Curated annotation (Swiss-Prot):
Record's keyword annotation contains Nucleus: no
Gene3D superfamilies assigned to the protein according to its UniProt record, in alphabetical order: AhpD-like
GO cellular component entries: cytoplasm; nucleus; TORC2 complex
Location in or out of the cell: Cytoplasm
Function per UniProt: May function as an intracellular leucine sensor that negatively regulates the TORC1 signaling pathway. May also regulate the insulin-receptor signaling pathway through activation of TORC2. This metabolic regulator may also play a role in protection against oxidative and genotoxic stresses. May prevent the accumulation of reactive oxygen species (ROS) through the alkylhydroperoxide reductase activity born by the N-terminal domain of the protein.
Region of interest: C-terminal domain: 310-492
Protein name: Sestrin-3
Main location: cytoplasm
Length: 492
């Protein structure tokens, strides 16, 4: 793994094509024309987001009321395509960052930095570096983890596990953090920290999945910006992220007429609904289908596996800039499939044994009052959010599709719902969409515009943002379920 310095806005993991490596040896910063990074998203035309914002005055009110930065940042602009959800998001985020709670304000922002650093999300790191200083944080802490108090350092292990393999968290991890001593965490403090970590891991998925651009610097007036290479290769940036690479456009991103693709999806939804009404699968059959889907997720390639294509123009180079690495311990630790090939692995997390509604919600509310209500409202909002449309079709019940997206994320994290037929996942989620979901959820820093464009090509950008919101909240809930279950076991 190479390491190098970078600008303060540098993000980290990215694929390097051979030609660009030569350029990067000379300068980690590449001068590109400002129009290539104009607007809140590199994936969504600026006019689509701007139109939504000008029409909806509610967004401006929400920003004034709940934004910690006091301005309409790029995340908020993209989320404003779904104003109902945006309100739930901003209220919960404002509560965990600014309202009364167990942790001091600077700690909250430093924990956000630590969480974002696990996915090398410079956008969030920069945002919370500013907020950390504004709330009275000690500037020396920004030099890296070796400069922070030991009790913050002690969060590294649970931060790492939550971000990449939450199923490994046990009550022993909790006991280690709350044991008696000068650096111990109280349970309310730990719950607050866990909520922040899960929130910012998941938000990093949204940032990369939606192609959120760096905030514009008002001091730049010459039409050019020095930007650091993010999760795109340099030639992606120069060509608006349109990679001309056969290895990325083979069987994984099969070219299908997008109209017939949409009609086929609609037909599958209709057929599944009819089958569901005709007969109900047995519990044994449902369990078998979950295990099958869990194992099949092993073979869904994600962003990092593009490296393994033979004779690819991409090389297995990962650069973590010093600006990000200072906040990370064990940078090589990442996601591994819950069901690894040829191995007897960890037992499946049966959602019915520890649910958010019956267990997690009450524990969070008991130890960190009111955040449970805000999180619950946000989870319900995104899960039930619908406009009853699919691309150009109206009066469509999308419940089945939303549930498949949510449950597929949980499946990759080893969480099973006894009452869900996982055969529906294979019927409803095409391979290119599964690639996108796995990358955004498990390796968000590797998401590319090509992947975003490759699925549901007839759908509106607002519908794809809705997908990203579902993925973000499904991921956050999965992390919380594992962490809160471990805390519950510690208490019993």
């Amino acid at each position: 793994m190479n390491r190098g310095g970078g600008s303060p806005s540098a993000a980290a993991n990215y694929l390097l094509c051979t030609n660009c490596r030569k350029v990067l040896r000379k300068d980690k910063r590449i001068r590109v024309s400002q129009p290539l990074t104009r607007g809140p998203s590199a994936f969504i035309p600026e006019k689509e987001v701007v139109q939504a914002n000008t029409v909806d005055e509610r967004t401006n009110f929400l920003v004034e009321e709940y934004s910690t930065s006091g301005r309409l940042d790029n995340i908020t602009q993209v989320m404003s395509l779904h104003t109902q959800y945006l309100e739930s998001f901003l209220r919960s985020q404002f509560y965990m960052l600014r309202m009364d709670g167990p942790l001091p304000l600077p700690y909250r922002h430093y924990i956000a930095i630590m969480a974002a650093a696990r996915h090398q999300c410079s956008y969030l790191i920069n945002m919370h570096v500013d907020e950390f200083l504004k709330t009275g944080g000690i500037a020396e802490w920004l030099n890296g983890l070796e400069y922070v108090p030991q009790r913050l350092k002690n969060l590294n292990e649970i931060n790492k596990l939550l971000a990449h393999r939450p199923w490994l968290i046990t009550k022993e991890h909790i006991q280690k953090l709350v044991k008696t001593g000068e650096n111990n965490w109280s349970l309310p403090e730990l719950v607050h920290a866990v909520v922040l970590l899960a929130h910012y891991h998941a938000l990093a998925s949204f940032v990369f999945g939606s192609g959120i651009n760096p905030e514009r610097d008002p001091e730049i007036s010459n039409g050019f910006r020095l930007i650091s290479v993010n999760n795109f290769c340099v030639c992606d940036l120069a060509n608006d992220n349109n990679i001309e690479n056969a290895s990325l456009s083979g069987s994984n991103f099969g070219i299908v007429d997008s109209l017939s693709e949409l009609e086929a999806l609609m037909e599958r939804m209709k057929r599944l609904q009819e089958e569901r009404e005709d007969e109900e699968a047995s519990q044994e059959e449902m369990s078998t289908r979950f295990e099958k889907e869990k194992k099949e997720s092993l073979f869904v390639v994600s962003g990092d596996t593009f490296h393994s294509f033979p004779h690819s123009d991409f090389e297995d180079d990962m650069i973590i800039t010093s600006d990000v690495s200072r906040y990370i311990e064990d940078p090589g630790f990442g996601y591994e499939d819950f069901a690894r090939r040829g191995e007897e692995h960890l037992p499946t997390f049966r959602a019915q044994d520890y649910t958010w509604e019956n267990h997690g919600f009450s524990l969070v509310n008991r130890l960190y009052s009111d955040i449970g209500h805000l999180l619950d409202e946000k989870f319900r909002m995104v899960y039930n959010l619908t406009y009853n449309t699919m691309a150009t079709h109206e009066d469509v019940d999308t419940t089945m599709l939303r549930r498949a997206l949510f449950n597929y994320v949980h499946c990759m994290f080893g969480i099973r719902y006894d009452d869900y037929d996982y055969g529906e996942v294979n019927q409803l989620l095409e391979r290119s969409l599964k690639v996108y979901i796995k990358t955004v959820t498990c390796y968000p820093e590797r998401t590319t515009k090509r992947m975003y464009d490759s699925y549901w090509r007839q759908f509106k950008h607002s519908e794809k943002v809705h997908v990203n919101l579902l993925l973000m909240e499904a991921r956050m809930q999965a992390e919380l379920l594992y962490a809160l279950r471990a805390i519950t076991r510690h208490l019993t």
